[in-house]
A protein has these predicted regions:
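Short, charged cytosolic
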Residues: 42-69
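N-terminal, intrinsically disordered, low-complexity segments
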Residues: 1-47
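Transmembrane alpha-helical segments and their cytosolic interface motifs
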Residues: 74-101
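Alpha-helical membrane-inserting segments
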Residues: 94-102, 130-137
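Cytosol/matrix-facing juxtamembrane amphipathic
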Residues: 22, 35-39, 43-51, 119, ...
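A structural signal for conserved, well-ordered secondary-structure elements
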Residues: 19, 23, 52, 79
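Membrane-interfacial hairpin junctions
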Residues: 104-114
Length: 175
């Protein structure tokens, strides 16, 4: 489907994909540096947000290193095991196969209950089959490790209610 790939590689979708790759790479670098705790992120065309307890300077240094390493060709950093893409792919596969297992059960409750173990088994099979698919979809669709022309603009810390810390990592494309 070359037209889909062409769409993904231009303008707004491409900027989101590149920032998504940098977000993942930053999380990998922070993990390598032993930053403990739960961190998460979300990307958009102007950068990404990091949720969790990390010092602003540490995050900045991690993002700088991540950008450098992606630019040097470490494209594997763009794929992250905890990405929501993996969850979405697994959920769709599990739900889709479980739904197929329940097809044709309209009517009696006893018929539905009899089919329930099959639906559960099909859901588990779907989830397991989808595990290698999530990272592949990250690599091909939701991230782009080509960071040429990208620069970090700033990292801003926001302390929100209940002691939650979020950071905005802003980027800019120069090409």
């Amino acid at each position: 489907m070359p037209e889909i790939q062409e769409f993904l590689n231009q303008g707004l979708p491409n900027r989101v994909r590149i920032n998504h790759a940098l977000e993942h790479a930053t999380l990998h670098v922070l993990q390598e540096k032993g930053i403990a705790g739960r961190l998460g992120g979300i990307s958009d065309a102007g950068g990404f947000w990091i949720y969790g307890d990390v010092a602003t300077e540490t995050l900045l240094l991690g993002a700088q290193e991540a950008l450098k390493r992606l630019a040097e060709g470490e494209s594997a950093l763009a794929v992250h095991p905890n990405c929501g893409t993996n969850l979405a792919v697994g959920s769709l596969a599990a739900g889709g196969l479980a739904w197929m297992g329940m097809r044709g059960t309209k009517g009696k409750m006893s018929r539905r209950l009899a089919r329930l173990p099959i639906a559960i088994l099909m859901g588990i099979i779907g989830y397991q089959l989808a595990k290698p698919l999530g990272p592949k979809i990250q690599e091909q669709v939701t991230t782009n490790a080509d960071v040429s022309g990208m620069e970090l603009v700033q990292v801003l810390r926001h302390d929100v209610a209940s002691g939650i810390t979020i950071h905005r990592v802003s980027t800019r494309m120069t090409r």
